Swiss-Prot record:
It holds the Pfam family CoV_M. It comes from Porcine transmissible gastroenteritis coronavirus (strain Purdue). This is Membrane protein. The gene is M. GO terms for cellular component: host cell cytoplasm; host cell Golgi membrane; membrane; viral envelope; virion membrane. Residues 237-252 are annotated as: Interaction with N protein. The chain crosses the membrane at residues 48-68, 78-98, 113-133.
Length: 262
């Protein structure tokens, strides 16, 4: 509260009689010697009045918001991660609704400059929202994975093994991909993506799907121990194109599967 009062004093010095601060807890007169008492002075400045009455509530909201952003990752908590995704999905429509409402309110009071800025903000928000959906649908078309609609997903790693496709969302395109096999469990980027595998099940190539293209990574080296189903395999970029990442179960060669177009 003292910080808010100091802030109010600074604003009072800059803005004259609209904002003020109390001389003491008992004296309700303003420090800048205005005729009105501090209650009317605070009410006259909406921002200061709001901070003075809602600062604790906003601090709790911001603490929760920071916690969700900081620890909203699957390796920490799936629950917090789900809340983070919900917030990110709701931000676009909420911001769009706020800009439209602000445009309406500014038009009602004939503030046409702010009305223009509000309309521009609404258009930009809507375009960015549509771009998100377009990119997500393009990525889903390649991978058939709901991770495509994750706002943080820039690419999806696709590994075909045992007749199935295993996917992992990525925040960027890697230079190389390492698959680690530990006691029959397959790991990529530190995450377990499959179980019950042996060295013969490791694929000859993996793919990283982007909205615009699919990058193929070919196996270039591996070190495996058959007795314990443990080892690693390393893949590097070999080609890129409009390839499908779906696992094929029909009688196709590896090259034919690779050239299967979306």
């Amino acid at each position: 509260m003292k910080i808010l009062l100091i802030l109010a004093c600074v604003i009072a010095c800059a803005c004259g009689e609209r904002y003020c601060a109390m001389k003491s807890d008992t004296d309700l007169s303003c420090r800048n010697s205005t005729a009105s008492d501090c209650e009317s002075c605070f009410n006259g400045g909406d921002l200061i009045w709001h901070l003075a009455n809602w600062n604790f509530s906003w601090s709790i909201i911001l603490i929760v918001f920071i916690t969700v952003l900081q620890y909203g990752r699957p390796q920490f908590s799936w629950f917090v991660y789900g809340i983070k995704m919900l917030i990110m999905w709701l931000l676009w429509p909420v911001v769009l609704a706020l800009t439209i409402f602000n445009a309406y309110s500014e038009y009602q009071v004939s503030r046409y400059v702010m009305f223009g800025f509000s309309i521009a903000g609404a258009i930009v928000t809507f375009v960015l929202w549509i771009m998100y959906f377009v990119r997500s649908i393009q990525l889903y078309r390649r991978t058939k994975s709901w991770w495509s609609f994750n706002p943080e997903t820039k690419a999806i790693l696709c590994v075909s093994a045992l007749g199935r496709s295993y996917v992992l969302p990525l925040e960027g395109v890697p230079t190389g991909v390492t698959l680690t096999l530990l006691s029959g469990n397959l790991y990529a980027e530190g995450f377990k993506i499959a179980g019950g595998m042996n060295i013969d099940n490791l694929p000859k190539y993996v793919m990283v799907a982007l909205p615009s293209r699919t990058i193929v990574y070919t196996l270039v080296g591996k070190k495996l121990k058959a007795s314990s189903a443990t080892g690693w395999a390393y893949y590097v970029k070999s080609k890129a194109g409009d390839y499908s990442t779906e696992a094929r179960t029909d009688n196709l060669s590896e090259q034919e599967k690779l050239l299967h177009m979306v």
